[in-house]
């Protein structure tokens, strides 16, 4: 039977707030409150997904394995994540911590699971962000060579990127939102131009809807398409991390989440359908086999003009930068929250007095990125095949695991309290989402060789990093419970009251 959520025994009201207040002194004030609206937060999470990069760099691979029916894979992934968002957004109205996944999982599954989730989140977000420096390097190399015939070594580009992202993250969150807004409009705008050209011309064989027929959807490659499609939504769940900086977060966070999921699902499916129409259903597989990475550039040149293809090269680079900035901001806020919880070093909880950004956490994350980029460069690694794919693989799997755990946590949390959210939001949608997220994760793991091109042993290590991180977090929680019981007792507390958590 559900029970009222009540203050925990021995935890005074405002305990978490007092701890954060201690960290937010005159020397290190708090994050800027009520600065972000729905559009700002949506820009952050959509930018993290890097729509143009996903379309130009990954969608051709999805078409290659799934054929003409590939657009449906993106619709199905979007629908599954929208189902996840139902319970996720319901929980954001009850859990006011800005700790994101680890706070939600703590509320529903207990502190040991919450510590494990926090460790996985740090692994996953850092893996995604740092790995993409390899993509930034190769994307910039391609643009420089295509436009001006200049070759620059990839480590120089990646290291420059680390400093650029650090500077953008160091500035205020409003500044970052404006930068991401401009970059997102640029990358989506070029795809809209391509779509307009194809629609006005009628495509290579006339516009057709055969991508959505059962014969083209129910094919052996559909599972692989879904694996690519789920990976394309990475980062949408980070809306909750910006809770402390959002205006009216009870409304802003859910709206931004639904907008991000809805936009990405529809936009991805539409753009994949458009590029299929550009070559025609009978010729698209030949085009993908001949030049998969040039698919969108060739279509843009034919239907819009060479100038637009040149712009696409540039906007892919800015798309990658936008994605990295979004992940950098998310990591910094995870670090800030965990430092203010007393789990990470206190210095990471400092906020810049003027920009109100978690600048120390940003410096730490940038140093970590610099170390990994330099290490891969000194080892003679390939920036795409190794830096990108090896770092992104545990990152993507980790985020999917956190989504599955969060869906279960939603169900467990609402079983314990009285609420008026309804069975759809608290029972049916969360449990269905948990099954779908677990299934999606299994699809990705089962197709991991296709996605990385690495041998079995390498793939096994990359996949096992995720459960290893979770176990490490659980072990840390047990140590903290023994050595620092006050920190353990208030882990993932609400910012204003010590609400009861599971376990």
Model-identified regions with their sequence ranges:
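Membrane-interface loop-to-helix entry segments
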Residues: 154-201, 256-265, 398-401, 416-435, ...
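Membrane-helix boundary/coupling elements in multi-pass transport proteins
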Residues: 97, 120-135, 238-245, 306-346, ...
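A generic transmembrane alpha-helix motif of multi-pass inner-membrane proteins
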Residues: 394-402, 424-503
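TM-loop-TM module centered on a large, flexible mid-protein loop between adjacent transmembrane helices
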Residues: 103-104, 110, 142-146, 262-327, ...
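Helix-loop-helix junctions that connect adjacent transmembrane segments
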Residues: 27-32, 70-71, 147-153, 181-313
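Membrane-interface "cap" regions at the ends of multi-pass membrane proteins
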Residues: 1-59, 63-69, 82, 206-213, ...
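Helix-loop-helix connectors at the membrane interface of multi-pass transporters/channels
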Residues: 103-107, 134-154, 185, 243-249, ...
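Transmembrane helix-boundary motif of multi-pass solute transporters/channels
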Residues: 23-142, 239, 446-453, 461-464
């Amino acid at each position: 039977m559900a029970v009222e959520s009540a203050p925990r025994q021995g935890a005074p009201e405002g305990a978490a707030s007092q701890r954060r207040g201690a960290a937010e002194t005159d020397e290190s004030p708090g994050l800027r409150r009520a600065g972000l609206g729905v559009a700002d937060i949506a820009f952050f999470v959509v930018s993290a997904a890097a729509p143009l990069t996903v379309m130009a760099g990954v969608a051709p691979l999805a078409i290659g394995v799934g054929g003409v029916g590939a657009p449906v894979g993106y619709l199905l992934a979007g629908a599954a994540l929208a189902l996840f968002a139902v319970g996720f957004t319901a929980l954001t109205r009850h859990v006011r911590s800005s700790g994101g996944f680890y706070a939600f999982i703590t509320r529903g599954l207990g502190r040991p699971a919450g510590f494990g989730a926090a460790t996985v989140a740090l692994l996953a977000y850092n893996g995604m962000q740092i790995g993409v420096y390899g993509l930034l390097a190769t994307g910039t190399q391609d643009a420089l060579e295509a436009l001006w015939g200049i070759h620059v070594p990839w480590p120089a580009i990646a290291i420059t990127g680390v400093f650029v992202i650090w500077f953008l993250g160091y500035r205020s969150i409003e500044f970052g939102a404006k930068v991401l807004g401009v970059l997102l409009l640029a990358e989506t705008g070029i795809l809209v131009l391509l779509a307009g050209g194809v629609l006005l011309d009628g495509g290579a064989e006339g516009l057709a809807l055969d991508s959505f027929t059962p014969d083209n959807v129910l094919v052996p490659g559909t599972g692989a398409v879904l694996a690519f499609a789920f990976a394309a939504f990475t980062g949408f769940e980070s809306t909750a991390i910006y809770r402390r900086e959002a205006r009216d977060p009870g409304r802003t966070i859910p709206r931004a989440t639904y907008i991000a999921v809805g936009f990405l699902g529809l936009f991805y499916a539409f753009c994949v359908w458009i590029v299929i129409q550009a070559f025609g259903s009978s010729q698209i597989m030949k085009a993908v086999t001949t030049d998969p990475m040039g698919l969108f550039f060739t279509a843009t040149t034919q239907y819009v003009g060479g100038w637009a293809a040149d712009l696409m090269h540039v906007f892919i680079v800015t798309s990658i930068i936008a994605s990295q900035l979004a992940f950098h901001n998310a990591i910094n806020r995870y670090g800030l929250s965990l430092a203010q919880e007393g789990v990470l070093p206190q210095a990471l909880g400092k906020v810049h007095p003027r920009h109100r950004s978690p600048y120390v956490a940003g410096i730490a994350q940038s140093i970590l990125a610099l170390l990994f980029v330099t290490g891969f460069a000194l080892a003679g690694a390939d920036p795409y095949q190794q830096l990108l794919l090896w770092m992104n693989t545990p990152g993507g799997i980790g985020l999917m695991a956190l989504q599955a755990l969060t869906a279960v946590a939603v169900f467990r949390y609402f079983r314990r309290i009285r609420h008026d959210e309804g069975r759809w939001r608290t029972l049916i949608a969360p449990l269905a989402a948990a099954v779908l997220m677990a299934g999606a994760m299994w699809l990705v793991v089962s197709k991991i060789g296709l996605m990385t091109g690495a041998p079995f042993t390498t793939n096994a290590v990359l996949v096992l990093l995720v459960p290893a991180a979770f176990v490490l977090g659980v072990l840390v929680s047990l140590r903290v419970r023994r050595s620092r019981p006050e920190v353990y007792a208030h882990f993932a507390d609400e910012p204003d009251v010590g609400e009861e958590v599971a376990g």
